[in-house]
């Protein structure tokens, strides 16, 4: 291992050892009585500083280490617990906490105002109609009872609005009954990373409130791995209740469109060979490997 990663502090076992040392120091008899024999430590200022570096600075919670762990330890769960301890002490890195704070204050992590969001949607709708030469192409907003409530990453209206246009085009061509929300449209949740379950639950609640307000049938999480993980898997834990509607990734929906023939692909448009990446939150944590492969088999490309 040391040849693969010469920086010892980057090795997952080293990070785990720092957390386990504190556990032994506080919660085991031998660790309290004879810390020198067990390597036990108290959670003092120096150890807290070391934790910040280990679980925030040197860990993304991707879970790759657990796949290679000889005894199957769920390392991301341990590191999340350490982050929660640090969050309770106000030791979340400032830039990460600032992202959470702006989402709590404005409803999205980019601070996009409601007016700007709706203006962007209206503009992209016009662009979509011109692209397709079809005045019926729409981006519905707050459509009651729509089958699909589509949520987006705030970077799209802020920096990459054509991504929203591409999604809207697919929904239109598939004949989907869909809508976006005027409020509760941000799929991201950096509370997944800062270790504060109360703040994470508040951000997650915004999506659930939008679903309840509009009476939609399915919550679709757009392109974002951690957004899917937080809504689909962590959300029920934060809310202590399962949602009364399905929560799916847009990848699952696109896979279904391809299988059902609601959209088709032209093999002459793309000639490049590509490979399929199994991302951490969608595959290692989200269990969507079969979904990705099921969609990929419909693509007119060589893998």
Name each model feature, range by range.
Residues 1-8:
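Long, charged N-terminal interaction/targeting segments
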Residues 9-230, 234-235:
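Iron-sulfur-cluster electron-transfer modules
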Residues 12, 20, 258-303:
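Redox cofactor-anchoring modules in respiratory/redox and cofactor-processing assemblies
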Residues 152, 249-251, 278:
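Short, structured patches in soluble enzyme cores that scaffold and shape functional sites
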Residues 165-169, 236-237, 290-298:
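Short, solvent-exposed amphipathic alpha-helical segments in soluble enzyme
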Residues 174, 241-243, 299-300:
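Short, structured coil segments at secondary-structure junctions
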Residues 177-179, 246, 302-303:
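Conserved beta-strand segments of alpha/beta enzyme cores
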Residues 240-268:
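Short, flexible loop segments at boundaries between secondary-structure elements
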């Amino acid at each position: 291992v040391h040849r693969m990663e010469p920086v010892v502090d980057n090795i997952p076992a080293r990070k785990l050892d720092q957390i386990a040392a504190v556990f032994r120091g506080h919660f085991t008899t031998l660790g309290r009585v004879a810390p020198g024999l067990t390597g036990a430590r108290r959670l003092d200022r120096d150890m807290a500083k070391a934790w910040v570096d280990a679980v925030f600075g040197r860990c993304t919670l991707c879970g790759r280490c657990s796949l290679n762990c000889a005894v199957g330890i769920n390392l991301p769960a341990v590191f999340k617990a350490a982050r929660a301890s640090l969050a309770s002490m106000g030791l979340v890195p400032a830039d990460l906490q600032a992202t959470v704070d702006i989402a709590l204050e404005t409803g999205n992590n980019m601070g996009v105002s409601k007016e700007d969001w709706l203006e962007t949607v209206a503009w992209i709708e016009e662009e979509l109609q011109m692209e397709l030469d079809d005045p019926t192409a729409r981006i519905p907003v707050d459509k009651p009872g729509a089958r699909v409530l589509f949520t987006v990453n705030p970077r799209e209206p802020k920096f990459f609005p054509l991504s929203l246009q591409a999604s809207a085009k697919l929904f239109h061509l598939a004949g989907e009954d869909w809508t976006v929300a005027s409020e509760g449209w941000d799929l991201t949740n950096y509370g997944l990373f800062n270790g504060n379950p109360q703040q994470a639950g508040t951000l997650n609640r915004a999506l659930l409130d939008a679903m309840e307000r509009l009476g939609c049938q399915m919550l679709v999480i757009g392109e974002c791995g951690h957004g899917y993980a937080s809504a689909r898997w962590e959300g029920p834990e934060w809310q202590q209740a399962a949602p009364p509607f399905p929560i799916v990734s847009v990848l699952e929906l696109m896979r279904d469109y391809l299988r059902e023939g609601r959209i088709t692909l032209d093999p002459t448009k793309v000639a490049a060979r590509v490979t399929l990446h199994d991302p951490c939150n969608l595959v290692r944590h989200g269990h969507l490997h079969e979904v990705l492969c099921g969609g990929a088999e419909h693509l007119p490309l060589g893998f």
